[in-house]
Amino acid sequence: MKSIIFNEIKKILECDFALENPKDKNLAHFATPLAFSLAKELKKSPMLIASDLASKFQNHDCFELVEAVNGYLNFRISKTFLNELANQALTNPNDFTKGEKKQESFLLEYVSANPTGPLHIGHARGAVFGDTLTRLARHLGYKFDTEYYVNDAGNQIYLLGLSILLSVKENILHENVEYPEQYYKGEYIADLAKEAFEKFGKEFFSEENIPSLADWAKDKMLVLIKQNLEQVKIKIDSYVSERSYYDALNATLESLKEHKGIYEQEGKIWLASSQKGDEKDRVIIREDGRGTYLAADIVYHKDKMSRGYGKCINIWGADHHGYIPRMKAAMEFLGFDSNNLEIILAQMVSLLKDGEPYKMSKRAGNFILMSDVVDEIGSDALRYIFLSKKCDTHLEFDISDLQKEDSSNPVYYINYAHARIHQVFAKAGKKIDDVMKADLQSLNQDGVNLLFEALNLKAVLNDAFEARALQKIPDYLKNLAANFHKFYNENKVVGSANENDLLKLFSLVALSIKTAFSLMGIEAKNKMEH
């Protein structure tokens, strides 16, 4: 709606201007401070200029009122125009707020957790954010592909194999074993050990078979990770292996050398990242000739940046913050625009239950498993809470609040608004088709403002995507639900003289809730279950 109004205003003003959303919708739905920027050029006061501009909008179909207020030009949308937009939305509900196909393309790499165990709650935040960003981008018309980078070549994979070997020796063969400082523990390792022993037999469990054991376990963990993701309605387009990039390492090093991006010192090869803003240079090839994790990651990013996407986006854990300058430096040395590599950081999550820290999973050792939390509160509540705050800010929540059936549980509160609307239609014995001819002229100002809010979802979605600020969607839904509940409590609907106008208004509110929830990966309920 905002873009439509902007274009209508631009036809008359014939110049560029900023269009703002005033908080008090009783004063205006939109406003522009254009008169202030014209004051110097026209040598007039902003108030006079705004008054002159307002006079150009007399008898415009889109606006009920256009007036100058303290130098601002305020616009209130007409009921007739809002009704036209409502008819379009209700006639084609599946296309509501959808964007036209755009030329811009994106590649999102996210989750990319080491395939050494099930997903924990820290992985879940970036996973939910990435999936919602994907849904939103595609809904708005962007080409948006997703990828999971499988770290299947590093020391972590070897440690997985070693941990299983030691578990077999200790718990099945009852041998005395000495555990290294770093290893994987938890019930899932014991389960893998038992399964591996049954599959491979006693003779297999020697140090020389650790790589084979690690490969087998890695594949099992990748299947488990995909199941964890499916549990929260996430499907990633492609999984790429770190190992598959090994053959491209030498060519990448040659390219870096040509661009003076690397040098040799102390028997190691260093990335000269300090030249590009990093705090120091970084080792990419060790003294023994083995590449560091950074080396493999540079090769992978070179490939991603070469595929023709307008922008490559990564979602990383906040602990990778220091990794950003070195990766951007490498891309610049390789001739890419580092602005086309966008990094979104997912901050830490603190989980409580009844005010106390949530217990770590026995299955995973020292982590809270994502699947455990989903089992307790469901996928919808988990997704909502992870989207309720900006991704790069710390998030703390008590899962007990998400099990309540009252306004303190935002998922329940918003769903209750959606279910309530279905209940009202049932009580009135009507369907949406029965109210399509209502013209909404009888709506009071609160009703008009609620309708405006429901129809303004597209602007919220655009803002959320462009700013990567997905919390704008749950914020919008909370306000919409609160305003609906207030309006419903203050206005008689079934049996009133303007029943059809109110039901049509409510159907728009329900459509906005359903659309926004769908983009968040949440199901809008038609009926609340107790």
Swiss-Prot record:
Chain location of the short sequence motif 'HIGH' region per the record: 113-123
Signal peptide: none
Domain of life, source organism: Bacteria
Regions annotated as coiled coil: none
Keywords from the named record: Aminoacyl-tRNA synthetase, ATP-binding, Cytoplasm, Ligase, Nucleotide-binding, Protein biosynthesis
PROSITE patterns noted in UniProt: AA_TRNA_LIGASE_I (PS00178)
Compartments in which it is found: Cytoplasm
Similarity comment text for this entry: Belongs to the class-I aminoacyl-tRNA synthetase family.
Protein name: Arginine--tRNA ligase
Organism: Campylobacter jejuni subsp. jejuni serotype O:23/36 (strain 81-176)
Gene field: argS
